[in-house]
């Protein structure tokens, strides 16, 4: 696991609750055994929708219960491979949170109000 000293920069906002691991990385992309190459498939089904835009910033601000569903490790791998170093949300699925910390992807649980304020500000520094 990599050490985490400071993560700062612009945030990407995914204003959705109950985002499950199947939405983060669909099952058809789980055949790889290495941890790299998943970023291009992140939120694959949503990325095909008109108007979808999720910049590759260091920090993702998400909704409640982020990472629910199956316990696949591929979801944190895809988020990390896409460029995220931290995820800020009001709550996380327990197994997802554990999988994130194992690879050095920082899950930060804050109040819904704090998440909304960070999303509106568009930038944050975490240390």
Where do the model's predicted regions map?
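A short glycine-rich beta-strand->turn/loop micro-motif centered on a GG-aromatic cluster
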Residues: 83-96
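Glycine/serine-rich anion-binding loops at beta->alpha junctions
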Residues: 58-84
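Solvent-exposed alpha-helices and their adjacent loops that cap or buttress functional pockets
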Residues: 3-6, 52-54, 80-81, 116-118, ...
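Acidic, glycine-rich flexible loop/linker segments
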Residues: 103-127
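Short gly/pro/ser/thr-enriched loop/turn and capping motifs at secondary-structure boundaries
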Residues: 93-98, 114-117
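Structural motif
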Residues: 10-12, 22, 57-60, 85-87, ...
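N-terminal beta-alpha supersecondary unit
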Residues: 1-56
């Amino acid at each position: 696991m990599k050490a985490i000293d400071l993560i700062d920069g612009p945030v990407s906002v995914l204003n959705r609750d109950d985002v499950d691991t199947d939405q983060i990385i669909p099952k058809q992309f789980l055949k790889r055994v290495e941890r790299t190459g998943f970023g291009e498939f992140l939120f694959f089904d949503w990325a095909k929708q008109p108007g979808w835009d999720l910049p590759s910033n260091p920090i993702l601000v998400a909704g409640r219960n982020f990472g629910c569903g199956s316990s696949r490790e591929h979801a944190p791998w895809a988020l990390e491979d896409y460029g995220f170093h931290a995820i800020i949300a009001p709550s996380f699925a327990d197994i997802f949170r554990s999988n994130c910390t194992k690879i050095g992807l920082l899950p930060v649980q804050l109040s819904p109000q704090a998440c909304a304020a960070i999303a509106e500000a568009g930038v944050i520094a975490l240390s």
